[in-house]
Curated annotation (Swiss-Prot):
Subcellular location: Cell membrane
Listed GO CC annotations: plasma membrane
Highest taxon of source: Archaea
One Pfam family cited in the UniProt record for this chain: PGF-CTERM
Source species taxonomy: Archaea, Methanobacteriati, Methanobacteriota, Archaeoglobi, Archaeoglobales
InterPro entries the record matches: PGF_CTERM
Protein name: Uncharacterized protein AF_1487
Protein's organism: Archaeoglobus fulgidus (strain ATCC 49558 / DSM 4304 / JCM 9628 / NBRC 100126 / VC-16)
Length: 219
């Protein structure tokens, strides 16, 4: 299992713990580079101080001083310089912010990026159940009814195909609630921008080559 996949599983476990403990909103902000690497993948969990207290209490029972320490202890050592953890408080509400930066998804990661026929294809299967069906369990649906997922994706080029709720230029948004948030495959297909100035450089090289060829013929 790749380090990034382990980290993604950890992200989801934290999010799931919050969901099962009470109402919550989960936001994902993902930004992709034109070479297919991920510039940043940020997870923001917004919940109440009560739910946070339950999670912190669970962490202390496991021998950790805080929820932060509990989370950071699970991150592979080679990934620690690429991952940050922050908490932002506002009255009775808290935002848990976890971000990974500058990594290339492995083949077994939930986040998959590939180049195909001149396009860049992005998929995130983190929120797609294996059978892709909404649970019929009444208790499960009740627990998830207060859950919201907001996913924001920024691709390096214009998005030409996606299952997002909103698409504008190189950005896409998904806004999901309840059990449907865990039955969704995040998908987008974008153009791959050229290297700035590359076309101009080719034109200059072409003109120089033509000039040399013309000079030789004339000579």
């Amino acid at each position: 299992m790749s380090d990034m996949r382990r980290l993604m599983i950890l992200f989801l476990l934290v999010g799931l713990a919050v969901v099962l403990s009470g109402c919550a909103t989960l936001s994902v902000h993902s930004k992709v580079n034109k070479d297919g690497s991920v510039e940043s993948y940020k997870l923001v969990i917004n919940t109440s101080s009560f739910v946070y207290g339950l999670l912190a209490e669970g962490a202390k029972k496991e021998g950790y001083e805080s929820l932060r320490e509990s989370f950071l202890s699970e991150i592979p050592e080679e990934m620690r310089d690429k991952v940050s953890y922050d908490e932002v408080w506002s009255g009775d509400q808290v935002s848990i912010i976890i971000e990974a930066r500058d990594y290339v998804p492995a083949d077994d990661d939930k986040v998959k990026i590939r180049k195909e026929n001149g396009f860049l294809i992005y998929e995130d299967l983190s929120f797609a159940s294996e059978n892709n069906q909404t649970s019929s369990n009444e208790l499960g649906n009740a627990l998830l009814s207060s859950f919201s997922l907001h996913y924001y994706l920024e691709m390096p080029g214009k998005i030409v195909e996606s299952n997002a709720n909103v698409v504008k230029d190189n950005k896409a948004e998904w806004h999901l609630t309840g059990a449907s948030a865990f039955n969704t495959r995040i998908y987008a297909k974008s153009e791959v921008p050229g290297i700035p100035g590359f076309e101009a450089a080719l034109a200059i090289v072409g003109l120089l080559a033509a000039g040399l060829l013309f000079g030789r013929v004339k000579g």
